[in-house]
Amino acid sequence: MTPSERTSIIELIKREVIPAIGCTEPIAVALCVAKATEILGCKPHRIEAHLSANILKNAMGVGIPGTGMIGLPIAIALGALIGKSEYGLEVLKECTPDAVEAGKRMIADEAISIKLKEGITEKLYIEITASAATTASSATTASAATTASSCPQSATAIIAGGHTNFIYLSHNGEVLLDAPLKSTAEQNGNKTALTLKKVYDFATTAPLEEIEFILEAQRLNKAAAETSFKGRYGHQLGRTLKESTREMSILGNNTFSKILSYTTAACDARMAGVMVPVMSNSGSGNQGITATLPITIYAEENNKSREELIRALTLSHLTVIYIKQSLGRLSALCGCVVAATGSSCGITYLMGGGYNQISFAVQNMIATLTGMVCDGAKPSCSLKIASGVSTSLLSAILAMEEQCVSSVEGIIDNDVDKSILNLTRIGSESMNETDHAVLDIMTHKGC
């Protein structure tokens, strides 16, 4: 691998593995609102949001940090009231109780409109128009009297293709930015085109000082889990797995149960809207959690070295990034399938596996979890993460025994990269109708 290739991959990881507070879809909407408000230059009197189906799906049932509330309206209100676009996916980190109360009043005043954006194919699309009627005073030459006139102001911001990727900005009709939406391949560039072998080679040979930044993912995501253990968030799966005597009699107090408890606990806190940052991957905090904590706990429980941990985390996160390159940011496929595949690679590496065993682990994961639907971000995501992480451990164990699902079985190909493309084809193309059905069910449940 050339130095330029290595540099390109490091830059890719640093773009995709970033801190986030709260579920990234409503937070991305808040970010877009914050930018539109900044362009407007004052508090908007009305905000219109036109969103893709996948953004709507992932924002309907998830907690918004620091609010005790769920869903888009409060995220939009806070984006306008206290959001700062310079903070990126931590846009709401300065939320206060007073701001939440002001946001509730904004919602009660029906100042926020949320609609499905029709006629688009992009799955990650956020269009915000913020408007206000400012009062301007003008003095007549005939007298000292002044007259007040209403001067309508508006600003539009559009994010598409990535959770922080602004493609359009305007103020009162004047276009400030109009950037064409690039494909995933164009965004990544040819230099960062990946294969599983390239991912493995990079993770196992890159100079340690160039990739040790990945340890920040361990620090943030483990802290999120430990915060969760102290409270009662979501379905409390992580806390239950850690403390329940019933659980102890079934799973015991071992590496497996500890991995499950830490990983699901971090998800419990995040989906409940706890004001705690996590390290995300490819725009998803849950993916970042799932790619990080199983490896972190396995390494701690088995006394692995700092270098082994760094390389395993790098392998996991870069595998997730690689799979997402062809799957896309949002899809009908649950993101834990992808993230747990990354963690299975990292755990296999920590078990002493080489490239062949890591390939086997990926094949086993694809054979098992392909087709798990995403029905939005919500507290029960922790249950899906538990399924994904359990499978990642089983897949790694099988791989170390040289057991691999073969190409005569289902969607598995002899070439692991082709198996990955089979997975992402199903998730990004074949499950589109599933996505429509899921959103239709979610929006017509009558609850």
Where are these regions (language model features)?
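Acidic-glycine-rich active-site phosphate/pyrophosphate-binding loop
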Residues: 1-10, 42-55, 254-273, 305-323, ...
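N-terminal signal-anchor module of multipass membrane proteins
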Residues: 5-40, 44
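Functionally critical mobile loop/hinge segments
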Residues: 5-15, 86-130, 196-201, 211-243, ...
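Conserved phosphate/anionic-ligand binding catalytic regions in large, soluble enzymes, centered on
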Residues: 19-35, 276-293, 335-338
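Alpha-helical support elements that line or immediately flank enzyme active sites
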Residues: 26-42, 288-304, 344-352
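A structural-propensity feature for long, helix-poor, extended segments
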Residues: 45-89, 100-112, 308-356, 368-393
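Signature of multi-pass transmembrane helix bundles
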Residues: 108-136, 144-273, 439-447
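Membrane-embedded translocation segments of transport machinery
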Residues: 248-257, 270-303
